């Protein structure tokens, strides 16, 4: 089991507006998400050191863990959403994946295009066989993490 923490917001990648702390609990191929609203009084600029320190403090106060959560990388992409006719399967396609990193709370925009398109299919486990039997493709199905890919391109050497 692994827990992954991230702050998610939509719109301008440089302005953190209406951020949500997302805790993603993974157990093999099964994921669970917990969403916690963060409420800064004003939108925060990603390239403002004081704003990032403020956000870090708010997150750590809400989590109350033994370890401190710190900003490491920021991943941005253009996402399209699709839903099956009966709404049993959701598909997302992420393109133009870019990554930047935080160095001493300063955001360094690396503008790395990770040169891939990520297609994710999301559905309840009970539909697993159905989905696999319906797919007609020559692609390898694998796990993918834009976060892990971003770390690979960053200067951070973090134990994963």
For the regions a language model picked out, list residue spans one by one.
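Phosphate-end processing signature that detects enzymes handling 5′-triphosphorylated RNA
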Residues: 1-160
């Amino acid at each position: 089991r692994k827990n992954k923490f991230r702050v998610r917001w939509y719109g301008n990648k440089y302005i953190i507006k209406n951020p949500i702390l997302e805790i993603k609990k993974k157990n093999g191929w099964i994921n669970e998400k917990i969403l916690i609203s963060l409420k800064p009084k004003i939108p925060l600029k990603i390239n403002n050191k004081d704003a990032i320190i403020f956000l870090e403090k708010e997150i750590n106060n809400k989590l109350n863990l033994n370890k401190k959560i710190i900003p490491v990388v920021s991943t941005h992409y253009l996402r399209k959403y699709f839903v099956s006719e009966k709404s049993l399967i959701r598909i997302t396609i992420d393109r133009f994946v870019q990554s930047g990193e935080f160095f001493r709370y300063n955001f360094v925009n690396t503008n790395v295009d990770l040169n891939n398109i990520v297609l994710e299919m999301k559905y309840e486990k009970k539909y697993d066989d159905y989905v696999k039997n319906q797919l007609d493709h020559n692609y390898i199905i694998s796990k993918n993490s834009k976060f892990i890919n971003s770390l690979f391109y960053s200067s951070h050497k973090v134990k994963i």
